[in-house]
């Protein structure tokens, strides 16, 4: 992939928890947004109060939980991703 998130941005591949709903078809517009994903790439960091670059705490491959309305949904190379700020990440699964 030829892309790189900037600053404190994180590229996340959402994990869709598709649950069986019997024979009821739920349209995409009514489905819950995923709030869990796998970190694909991280930006170089953010500037702290002293002007220094502080690296991000998450790393490629981390499974994370993020806020429901975080980030921007994008499609790269026919795959769905979300670009979020590190501050929108609530948990890192260990």
UniProtKB/Swiss-Prot annotation:
InterPro entries: Chaperonin_GroES (IPR020818), Chaperonin_GroES_sf (IPR037124), Chaprnonin_Cpn10_CS (IPR018369), GroES-like_sf (IPR011032). CDD domains: cpn10. It comes from the Bacteria. GO terms for molecular function: ATP binding; metal ion binding; protein folding chaperone; protein-folding chaperone binding; unfolded protein binding. The keyword Cytoplasm applies. Keywords: Chaperone, Cytoplasm. Signal peptide: none annotated. It is found in: Cytoplasm. GO terms for cellular component: cytoplasm. Heptamer of 7 subunits arranged in a ring. Interacts with the chaperonin GroEL. HAMAP family: CH10 (MF_00580). This is Co-chaperonin GroES. It comes from Orientia tsutsugamushi (strain Ikeda) (Rickettsia tsutsugamushi).
